[in-house]
C-alpha cells in the first residue's frame, strides 16, 4: 500500500472486523509478520497477538466502531493519528492516539498506542 491514509483506514477496518478470518486477512495486508503493538494495557508481537487483542477489545466494547478522529500526519515512514471508539453518533466512549512505523514494504511494523479518554474502570 502506497497511500498512508488508506493504510491507516485499512488498519482501523481490522479493529472493526468481527469475522476472524476476514480480520486476519486484513491484518496480513497491513502488518508485517513480526509487527509490534504496544498500548497502556497490552504489548504483543506478531499478527496473531494483535488479532487476539482486537478480539478481546471487541468482546469488551461490542457494537462500538473505531474511526479516525482527524487527519493522518505522516513523514519518513512514521504516521500519527487520533482514533475514536464509539457508536458513530455523539461523543466517542474512548479516544486514543497511535504512532505507527511503516516498513519498506508499505506495511505497519510497529504501533505505539496511547489512551486519551477512557471510561472509568477500564
Mark where each language-model region is.
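Generic secondary-structure transition motif, activating predominantly at the C-termini of alpha-helices
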Residues: 12, 16, 31, 58, ...
Amino acid at each position: 500500500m502506497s497511500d498512508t491514509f488508506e493504510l491507516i483506514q485499512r488498519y482501523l477496518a481490522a479493529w472493526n472486523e468481527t469475522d476472524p478470518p476476514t480480520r486476519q486477512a486484513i491484518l496480513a495486508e497491513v502488518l508485517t509478520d513480526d509487527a509490534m503493538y504496544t498500548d497502556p494495557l497490552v504489548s504483543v508481537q506478531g499478527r496473531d497477538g494483535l488479532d487476539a487483542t482486537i478480539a478481546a477489545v471487541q468482546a469488551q466494547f461490542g457494537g462500538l466502531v473505531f474511526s479516525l478522529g482527524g487527519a493522518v500526519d505522516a513523514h519518513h515512514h512514521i504516521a500519527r493519528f487520533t482514533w475514536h471508539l464509539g457508536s458513530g453518533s455523539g461523543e466517542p466512549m474512548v479516544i486514543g492516539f497511535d504512532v505507527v512505523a511503516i516498513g519498506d514494504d508499505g506495511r505497519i511494523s510497529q504501533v505505539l498506542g496511547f489512551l486519551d479518554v477512557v471510561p472509568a474502570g477500564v
